[in-house]
Amino acid sequence: MPRSQKNDNFIDKTFTVLADIVLKILPTSKEEKEAFSYYRDGMSAQSEGEYAEALENYYEALKLEEDPYDRSYILYNIGLIYASNGEYVKALEYYHQGLELNFKLPQALNNIAVIYHYQGVQAIEDKDTELSKLMFDKAAQYWQQAIKLAPDNYIEAQNWLKTTGRMRNIQGY
């Protein structure tokens, strides 16, 4: 087994043990603990590329989780899976649902921008300049929001915004 895989397994096992301890000692309801358990299992399955299993766990977690902040991360992870599978419309739906519950989720804003940027590139390949401009403008809007929340992140997006003349309304620019 490669060293990096051993380290990953060690980290996964350590996380699982710590999560189990936290679940036992936190003063939370049975439903909250069960929701977290499903969420944790979903993250584990997702990291192993077992997307169908991850989705099952995330959907179970959504049924039980009541906290909007926690639900936003479950929805975000579901969006990640759909994006990984090339199902961009579904991914966008879940990212937006996550943002409705937690507007301070820069990674969701970034991923929405990435999808719109990809669609802009596809439109160029299809020689649809009007659609490409629309998609690139949408990407710019979401990247600007992500950068406002996390100014030290998304350097490639910041460079793209600058080089395309779309960098505006961001503090310091």
Swiss-Prot record:
It is a peripheral membrane protein. TPR repeats lie at residues 35-68, 72-105, 120-153. It holds the Pfam family TPR_8. It is found in: Plastid, Chloroplast thylakoid membrane. Keywords: Chloroplast, Membrane, Photosynthesis, Plastid, Repeat, Thylakoid, TPR repeat. One of its GO terms (cellular component) is chloroplast thylakoid membrane. The keyword Membrane applies. Its main location: plastid. GO terms for biological process: photosynthesis. Belongs to the Ycf3 family. PANTHER family: CELLULOSE SYNTHASE OPERON PROTEIN C, TPR-REPEAT-CONTAINING PROTEIN. Essential for the assembly of the photosystem I (PSI) complex. May act as a chaperone-like factor to guide the assembly of the PSI subunits. This is Photosystem I assembly protein Ycf3. It comes from Pyropia yezoensis. The lineage of its organism: Eukaryota, Rhodophyta, Bangiophyceae, Bangiales, Bangiaceae.
